Amino acid sequence: MMKTRRVVTGHNKDGRSVVKWDSALESKPGRDRFEKVDLWATDSLPARLTEDDPTQWNLGTSLANGSVFRLCRYEPGVAERWHRTDSLDY
């Protein structure tokens, strides 16, 4: 199982830089021999500043008017599935 450390920085009420989240994220199950980890998401463009962790949202392949930043790992021999969406992809 893929483990990823995610560090997200932001600003406090005084405008100083802070670490908002420093967490280990585990991959979510997908199809056979495929793993994914959601790193970040936005629900609008331009993106709004959020106080909640967007990886806890109900994320699909894409978000209407937003974006999903996802790390995907395919094991050797697995046929990838490319798709087309009207979305911002990282």
Tell me the role of every PLM-derived stretch.
Residues R16-Y90:
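A short glycine-rich, His/Asp/Glu-containing loop-to-beta-strand
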Residues M1-N12:
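Short acidic, Pro/Gly- and aromatic-enriched capping/linker segments at domain boundaries
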